[in-house]
Design a protein with these regions (language model features):
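Formylglycine-dependent sulfatase
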Residues: 3, 19-261
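Bacterial N-terminal signal peptides
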Residues: 4-16
Length: 261
């Protein structure tokens, strides 16, 4: 099965490279961190409002059987970037900021960065004339030598820090700053829309990887209050109103990206 998939991918990339720029599709990959498959309306969640994601599912394709071989941050990101099983590269757990020998359970130490000789999806698309961009959370290497701009991305804005205004920043890019009081997901959407508009005359690949809905939980108060009231009416502890608000933030982000396209 793996060989068939790899062959299909190479065939697709070869076909893309033979098309004229006018016929090459623009590609936007939105990767929402730690969101459960049943946390959106198109998978029968009736608590959180996700109209724009639901619309994409209705008008496009929806997976009903899917398995993640490494359902945490770095392994999944490794698979998406490389097209390979995480174990082949050695990123089998999330890449921590430092070695953690104090943990009560010590897992095998994973590879601590995506190797630079790994061919990423961005590098595979470059020969076909694509301009490539990466925005949001990276988590495939902590040093500057392992960032997206070293892995085939023409534009990168790696953002570090929690969700709420004033708590995050673009690493190494003092020229990219959020508006005063801006929620992180909204800022990530702004950067993505700018990339789309700046590259609309040529084929582009954009990967948008917001930090939401990863912990620590945090959302704007108006949305949190909306779901707090909704949860109170249900008279149960779950779902979590802050988490629900974060999902709605992501849904709005998706809607803005679709509208920009």
């Amino acid at each position: 099965m793996a060989r068939v998939i790899v062959l299909s991918l190479f065939t697709l990339l070869w076909a893309t490279g033979t098309l004229s720029a006018a016929d090459q599709p623009n590609i936007v990959l939105i990767f929402i961190d730690d969101m459960g498959w049943k946390d959106v309306g198109c998978y029968d969640n009736d608590f959180v409002d996700t109209p724009r994601i639901d619309q994409l599912a209705k008008e496009g394709m929806k997976f009903t059987d899917f398995y993640a071989a490494g359902a945490v941050c770095s392994p999944t990101r490794c698979a998406l970037q490389s097209g390979q099983n995480q174990a082949r590269i050695g990123i089998t757990d999330f890449i921590s900021g430092h070695w953690r020998p104090f943990e009560r359970v010590i897992t095998p130490r994973p590879t601590m960065a995506l190797p630079l000789d790994t061919v990423t999806v961005a590098e595979a698309l470059k020969p076909a004339g694509y301009t490539t961009g990466y925005i949001g959370k990276w988590h495939l290497g902590n040093g500057p030598e392992f960032q997206p701009d070293r892995q085939g991305y023409d534009f990168s804005a790696v953002i570090g820090g929690p969700h709420l205004p004033g708590k995050y920043r673009v690493q190494g890019r003092s020229d990219l700053k959020p508006k005063t009081g801006q929620y992180r997901t909204d800022f990530e959407a702004d950067l993505s829309i700018d990339f789309i508009r700046n590259n609309k005359q040529k084929p582009f690949f954009l990967m948008l990887s917001p930090f939401a809905v990863h912990i620590p939980l945090g959302a704007m108060s108006n949305k949190v209050e909306k779901y707090r009231k909704k949860a109170a009416d249900l008279k149960q502890d779950l779902p979590h109103p802050v988490y629900a608000a974060m999902i709605e933030h992501c849904d709005e982000m998706v809607g803005r990206i679709v509208d920009a396209i």
